């Protein structure tokens, strides 16, 4: 054993040396056996972004092959300098394809260099993989061999749009670099802002070759505009210059809003501290990478290897692009990686170019398929191409401060703005973002629109009208052709502007043609304000929902409502049956039935109490009862009733008749004396059924309202002035005129001031918001003007203006009528009739109870013999002298043998003295 241990210890170092030599030889053999695949890189030298990206590519391939040692392919990089020019990039790519026969190219670094490389790759079937060419315009080339291993700029447009919408800014100005990169985002911005009704007032293009003075001149131009929301889309080198000059001329002060795209926000790490100071208060939209395990490990390795150089988003995309290419190359390792070169006829020197003998990569289609389907979890998130590019789902909203950037929220696809990624509900309010420090070091949200003090005069459009000139009238001097604008609306606007807290210069521009005719409808005038031809519109412009999509209206300054106006007719022709009109048909029937009911109840009560009534013939009974019942109407009963119950019922019934007759008399008097004039038509439905012609003002929105109410379009007539309306009314529908007019209250009042007693307003009154001044969406003038309108309407200024233009119309407001005088119906007297019915039923029950009681008392007394009854009858002989009274005895009881000496039923007692005097 000792000998064995001695040999092992002696030759251990030798055995280890032999093993290491064997391992190195094996690795060298495997490396030599791996397929060398040439890949080109076209990036600019001496550029921080390109340098960081190239480091990331080398680091990605090194770590990938160390992890996947058994792969049969190895990418060999061929790096060419683009010289930061389009021509340099094109020459580099042509060299790599033609001379080096690379199977793929990573690059170029900018969107401007990409178009030629894309066409070159498409022709040679060499995939062009770019991690930094983000312009959406490159998609228009429609080359399948262009792989965008990054997001295009259109993906952030929705995030920018959400910010604008959340703060309710209505106008923006994009400031962009004047090249393919800057212009590429504009179509997407326009579409996104149109969806939320945000207007792009101006597009500011700044060339890379502009001097500082030229940039300053452009910024001064922006200062003269009212818009204060700017969206900056450019790279950091030009962006730093822009913000430095903007800071110098005080455009980063209170009231301004600056938003930068990810062209600057993603590269904040390579910008100096001075740039951050100049951008204090700026908002940024930055690409968001989740802090995955892969990203954290890469950042640690990056810091260890390169020290203070920060890993940015483009370096992450470059890292993932190299990994994806290595995986795809390994997948097609069995494919021929050579080029198929076709000789061209170059015998003529004048047609020979560098594109001659440009080969076609045999591996191109297979490599393209592999790249399109590769999927893995990279450092920048899931690497999976869709339509040849990566898709962005989340952006980070940052607030730039002097010390760096601060996250204030996020934008998530299909969710919107959120304060935290843990919140999945869409935010429609800026409060869902964290507090923001705005330019000027303020936390108050800028309005986004200010009236510049050095601006030119506002161009205020006024309508050209052929009538109703009390509201707006445009006249032109025959010699100078200078327009003069007057009217109620103009005086209101002038008064409002004179009370504004700041001076506003404006001029009236008639909305007419060169020959002085109206240029179009009010809708067209409002739409031209939206298009920017005018800075506002003043006149009798009604506030409508469809118009509010294009302009902002100040508060209304006129009365509201739309009504029908019809002629009135003489109400003295009442007809022969006017006396029936105070009561409705139902009330007449109820009253007649009540008389019949009262008669029946009287019959019942009197039948039990009146012997004379019982002895009458049936026809006499009926006539007596109903005569008695109806005579109560005039309180003229011929004879008193014999029944206590009848008397009570008659008292209640007379009370009801008193109220009924008094109400009838009052209503009939009103019909015969008060109502002298009545509208020819009482309701809109009657107009629709009658099919008469209806007038409306030319160019008014009331035409659409009439069509919506299903009025026949062929029956609608137009008028331009009160005089034309009057003329149409005189002709009537039968002669091509009108029998009704549909217009706003303000115009109807003006017409009624002249013809108050001849026309009337009928129901219903339709809602409208009145007249308002129109301004561009988001205009700060709207709130200030609305405040001044409230001030003058609450004071005496508005009354003075109204008296100036509409004096004498106020008394006509009472001519508005409703239907004919209200008839009395049975509902008004339900309680009285119910009282009569209840009282009658109670009396009937009392009568029946009393009769039953008497019957029981009588049955309890013994009956007299016949002879006693006869004796009693002879004794009294129908009339007895009781003291000094003559007594009339009920003979019926005597005949029924129910009369005793103790009980003598007396029907009527009369003093003897009265009979003697008679």
Swiss-Prot record:
Please list the residue ranges that the record places on the Cytoplasmic side of the membrane. 608-616, 638-647, 850-918
Q: Per its record, what are the GO molecular function terms?
A: calcium channel activity; G protein-coupled receptor activity; glutamate receptor activity; ligand-gated monoatomic ion channel activity
Its Gene Ontology cellular component terms are: plasma membrane
Q: Where in the cell is it found?
A: Membrane
Segment forming the signal sequence: 1-30
Which InterPro entries does the entry link to?
Answer: ANF_lig-bd_rcpt, GABAb_receptor_plant_PBP1, Glu/Gly-bd, GPCR_3, Ionotropic_Glu_rcpt, Iontro_rcpt_C, Iontropic_Glu_rcpt_pln, Peripla_BP_I
**Can you supply a Gene Ontology BP term from the record?**
calcium ion transport
Positions with biased composition (Low complexity): 866-881
Report membrane topology.
Multi-pass membrane protein
Q: What does this protein do?
A: Glutamate-gated receptor that probably acts as a non-selective cation channel. May be involved in light-signal transduction and calcium homeostasis via the regulation of calcium influx into cells.
Which family is this sequence assigned to?
Answer: Belongs to the glutamate-gated ion channel (TC 1.A.10.1) family.
Per UniProt, subunit arrangement is: May form heteromers.
Q: What protein am I looking at?
A: Glutamate receptor 2.5
Report the gene name: GLR2.5
